Amino acid sequence: GWAVPFAQQSAETWRRAFEVNLTAPFVLTQACAEALAKSRCGSVINIGSIYGLVGPDWGLYEGTSLGNPAAYGASKGGLAQLTRWLSTTLAPTVRVNCIVPGGVWRNQDQAFHERYLKKVPLRRMAIEEDFKGAVAYLASDLSAYVTGQELVVDGGFSTW
């Protein structure tokens, strides 16, 4: 199971989370690396998570069906390190960065939503539109001298 207590989190769930969040970006970047290098302006943009930066606040989840399994944060933290590793390995012809989103509104439980808003200085959860500027920036020449970085787009969640 995914949203279950730590003692019930399975190795299979752990493996699948790492497959999706860490192995897939590794394999995809590896498959594209030569073409990106030939372009001499390649840009890889990974998608991390605030839970790759900070530990979970369990109070957000109390009384809801939501959870925060160990595999999620660990795999997203690993993706941040893979981003840094790839940025030095694929340089100077390919830049590699990571967007780190905060909570995204997906009709979560009302109690979770209300608690989450109190943790965010901007007092709202993100919507997909909130990330387009970060993606455009990292994909463009505006970030020609930016590599190996995590661009946090979390409404201020991680500032407290």
Model-flagged regions — what are they?
Residues 1-13, 37, 45-91, 103-104:
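Catalytic loop of short-chain dehydrogenase/reductase
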Residues 6-9, 17-18, 116:
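A hydrophobic alpha-helix adjacent to the NAD(P)-binding/active-site core of NAD(P)-dependent oxidoreductases
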Residues 29-30, 84:
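A short, exposed helix-loop element centered on a Lys and neighboring polar residues
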Residues 41, 91-95, 146-148:
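Short, small/polar-rich loop/turn modules that mediate ligand/substrate recognition or access, typified
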Residues 46, 95-105, 139, 152-154:
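Conserved SDR Rossmann-fold cofactor-binding beta-strand/turn motif
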Residues 56, 63, 136, 147-160:
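Short C-terminal tail/terminal secondary-structure segment
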Residues 120-131, 142:
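A conserved structural motif in NAD(P)-dependent oxidoreductases
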